[in-house]
């Protein structure tokens, strides 16, 4: 990871426990990590559209929370990378836990009656979220957050594999695409961390536009944001299929995937 900021900036000296590989205040005096900030748009705008469409289609409120949870992560991450302040770091990292808990609930409760509420997993996930929050506020160790987040992601992967193996195998392309895109982001996140010094040296020699492409933490945002969005589509497709709706994946302008859900056919 990068050392502390070597340029003065609007938000002052970083107070966060993490400072990523992008040079601080290299592009804008008002944004500490420019590319790591603007790359969060993929986690902010598309999920807002998804939440609105979910409401229009009259679907369960849990999926509105799922979409808005991803938006909350994007907004928090924007604030964190823009400022590199500790409070904004928490605004990024804690919603990652909370939103992933919503994802877990949606996916593990997708084969239940419509509008059913299972309070047991809600209580378990709530206790998990509170416990992680309390421990992380006292023990400011990023690896703890990363392990807890990874645990939730592992739960989602296992459940997804079960669904596409034993229940709806035709959803494998959507599920595996989501997982592959997410893991590509995770790979670049690790490269950015491990080879930070090499990347920073290379950027000094490359044209600015080319150097921007090597901002692998920004690519982590883009790919994991897309992977998480596709996971919501997979979860929603699974749920609405079980409820006898007629979900279809369509592409806005032939590029961006969305779910269109038609009501069950009337006999």
Give the ranges of each region predicted by the language model.
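Multi-pass alpha-helical transmembrane bundles in non-GPCR membrane proteins
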Residues: 2-267
